[in-house]
Amino acid sequence: MSPEEWTYLVVLLISIPIGFLFKKAGPGLKRWGAAAVGLGLTLFTCGPHTLHSLVTILGTWALIQAQPCSCHALALAWTFSYLLFFRALSLLGLPTPTPFTNAVQLLLTLKLVSLASEVQDLHVAQRKEMASGFSKGPPLGLLPDVPSLMETLSYSYCYVGIMTGPFFRYRTYLDWLEQPFPGAVPSLRPLLRRAWPAPLFGLLFLLSSHLFPLEAVREDAFYARPLPARLFYMIPVFFAFRMRFYVAWIAAECGCIAAGFGAYPVAAKARAGGGPTLQCPPPSSPEMAASLEYDYETIRNIDCYNTDFCVTVREGMRYWNMTVQWWLAQYIYKSAPARSYVLRSAWTMLLSAYWHGLHPGYYLSFLTIPLCLAAERQLESALRWRLGPGGQKAWDWVHWFLKMRAYDYMSMGFVLLSLRDTLRYWASVYFCVHVLALAALGLGLALGRGGPGRRKSGAPAPSPASGKLREE
């Protein structure tokens, strides 16, 4: 592991005992204590580059104050424009930020765009209320008022997920501050249930990255290996990539769980990133609070089992980096300048690649996803319904295998980063996933789409496994 990876791990691990300290604290101590810890971590890891996050926060707050009715689009333009400046600093002859600064900036961008959207929703609701002349009560998830500058700073620098996620809305943050009877919210047992696979994933990461180092792919000797060996190598590389993020995101979720952050009654049917989808009145007594069943779906960032064993490329996206996927769906996909599912997905993947960075490998990887989505959707609707139950089960296993190989292939761009290294590797395996996706798309178009009833009856199974294994 690199020194940077050790630093990330230490930050994640110390967040767990800190969470237990803050869990039962009052709103004021939670707000300012969590912000002080987060700011301290930022200053320690980023040093003077912390100024970038401060400038981004102040700029967004100014836009919210100046144009509350359109601040969402303005905040999106401002934060994404600042990302371009932030990543071009070395080209401008300015000091290059640390990797930790980049991590803080990425999560901060998501939080500030979401905050602006929540403020805009509040402004629209207030205007509708004034026009109608009566109040219907606060809609689900609406903010009580526009956050002040200090409140915006406290949300932005809250230590929870400050470098690794999960992303959370300001409404989720407020619910944590104002959580009634936090002592009744379970933490230790949910944390242990969530944390148990992390040591195994960590060992698998160390083993796979040692046996199959990524640097080997950049060496000329690698391309003298036979084709089967080159094809196989992307499998353990992506495996190590997954194990690394599984450990990081599970540890980040455990930090949230320790603090009771993102805990809602199961009846609220919370979604990762978005929070509750059903109104659930707060408990009126400690006994009532203790009788409720809670979950931490709001801050759930990874579903390890379904990431590995779901059938389709589309499902695989849904279970990976789940809170960020919610953000992309809510703020990018829904406002995409196209109506086609594939084109909207391409737009979303383009901005996702930009959010990650300027390395060409990001764009090569992310912009391969829409092709895979189009291919699997077209072939699914044209062919799967023609098969019997046994044939559909076999189809799903083959589909799952190809989905995993597609992600293996695309991950090489994500980890190799450069245009030369990515294209060199893909060329060495004859751009197999691109060729296969184009062939599947062509076959699906040639066969045509099935009838609506047939497509519905031939819907893919959620997983090729016989039963659904959950980690919690």
Swiss-Prot record:
Top-rank taxon: Eukaryota
Pathway: Lipid metabolism; phospholipid metabolism
Catalytic activity line of the entry: a 1-acyl-sn-glycero-3-phospho-(1D-myo-inositol) + an acyl-CoA = a 1,2-diacyl-sn-glycero-3-phospho-(1D-myo-inositol) + CoA; a 1-acyl-sn-glycero-3-phospho-(1D-myo-inositol) + (5Z,8Z,11Z,14Z)-eicosatetraenoyl-CoA = a 1-acyl-2-(5Z,8Z,11Z,14Z-eicosatetraenoyl)-sn-glycero-3-phospho-(1D-myo-inositol) + CoA; (5Z,8Z,11Z,14Z)-eicosatetraenoyl-CoA + 1-hexadecanoyl-sn-glycero-3-phosphocholine = 1-hexadecanoyl-2-(5Z,8Z,11Z,14Z-eicosatetraenoyl)-sn-glycero-3-phosphocholine + CoA; 1-octadecanoyl-sn-glycero-3-phospho-(1D-myo-inositol) + (5Z,8Z,11Z,14Z)-eicosatetraenoyl-CoA = 1-octadecanoyl-2-(5Z,8Z,11Z,14Z-eicosatetraenoyl)-sn-glycero-3-phospho-(1D-myo-inositol) + CoA
UniProt keyword annotation of Repeat present: no
GO molecular function: lysophospholipid acyltransferase activity; O-acyltransferase activity
Function recorded in the entry: Acyltransferase which catalyzes the transfer of an acyl group from an acyl-CoA to a lysophosphatidylinositol (1-acylglycerophosphatidylinositol or LPI) leading to the production of a phosphatidylinositol (1,2-diacyl-sn-glycero-3-phosphoinositol or PI) and participates in the reacylation step of the phospholipid remodeling pathway also known as the Lands cycle. Prefers arachidonoyl-CoA as the acyl donor, thus contributing to the regulation of free levels arachidonic acid in cell.
Subunit structure, as described in the record: Interacts with SPTSSA; the interaction facilitates MBOAT7 location to mitochondria-associated membranes (MAMs).
Protein known as: Membrane-bound acylglycerophosphatidylinositol O-acyltransferase MBOAT7
Species of the source: Bos taurus (Bovine)
Gene this protein is translated from: MBOAT7
